[in-house]
Amino acid sequence: MNRENAKPFAHSKHYLYFWQKYSDQMNENVLAKLKILAESAKYDVSCSSSGTVRRNQSGALGNTVGGWGICHSFAEDGRCISLLKIMLTNYCIYDCAYCINRRSNDIPRATLSVSELVDLTIEFYRRNYIEGLFLSSGVVRNPDYTMERLVRVAKDLRLVHKFNGYIHLKSIPGASRELVNEAGLYADRLSVNIEIPKEENLKLLAPEKDHKSVYQPMRYIQQGILTNKEDRKKFRHVPRFVPAGQSTQMIVGATTESDKDILYLSSSLYQHPTMRRVYYSGYISVNTYDKRLPALKQPPLVRENRLYQAD
């Protein structure tokens, strides 16, 4: 999926139409939060609505057709579809050099409550502006606190509002097995971003992070999917667990990894049967004041494209 098809929902014509027509009917504070958090979410390209089907059920809301794309994309019959791509909050306890939402940046900040985000999703979905939700978040307090709030959003959508649209949740690195497993009961896809392929380079740009906190939730997701497949062979009505599998994202060009290094890691990830897609995101110079980062005039989009071709 190219960068053009991964535009954030906040830049869409549907969003602008919604803003102009319904802003007088909605809480202005919520709409202001929506604008900030949709903008903050745009740097994450690792979302896709392909790979799952949720058929409408009696008394339920909507349905998802497998094979459709991310944010703004097109179905095989030519129809344009959208996901609401948003963050729960862009506050973060981490100070990662490559991230626009890093703790030390002086940027507009916002946090949506669980009920506000659920209501927004349902409102947009009822008006046919979106096919589903791509939800990520900055980390506040600790990984489990943040992950629990993400799970509550998905759980309320599924159980309270009978939402049958697509849900992609970003699992928080360092989150507990219990919360990851609960998320898998309500999300179509879970993803944990590796971000920087080599741990020594991750430590250089994000000293508070490590690869263990990323790979551990990946293992939880894989184990949950494989166990669920076996259970469904024995028991017909076992609920599906992350039916669209998992994905991850790596930043390209922020550190010294070669294409060979990146593709070697991707190849090892694809050895796991639950890894559906590795996304590559050309580094965007958002924090030019940080001398640990390369001085790039523009993202390495050709390199990004070549990695997708090789992948």
Regions found by a protein language model. Give the residues of each.
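Flexible, acidic/Gly-rich N-terminal and inter-domain linker regions that tether
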Residues: 2-91
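Local cysteine-cluster metal-coordination motifs and their immediate loop/turn environment
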Residues: 90-102
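Core AdoMet radical
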Residues: 102-117, 125-150, 156-177, 184-235, ...
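Short, acidic/polar
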Residues: 114-121, 176-181, 258-267
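Short, surface-exposed basic-aromatic patches at helix termini and helix-loop junctions that form
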Residues: 182-189, 267-271
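Conserved C-terminal portion of the radical SAM core fold
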Residues: 194, 198, 213-289, 302-311
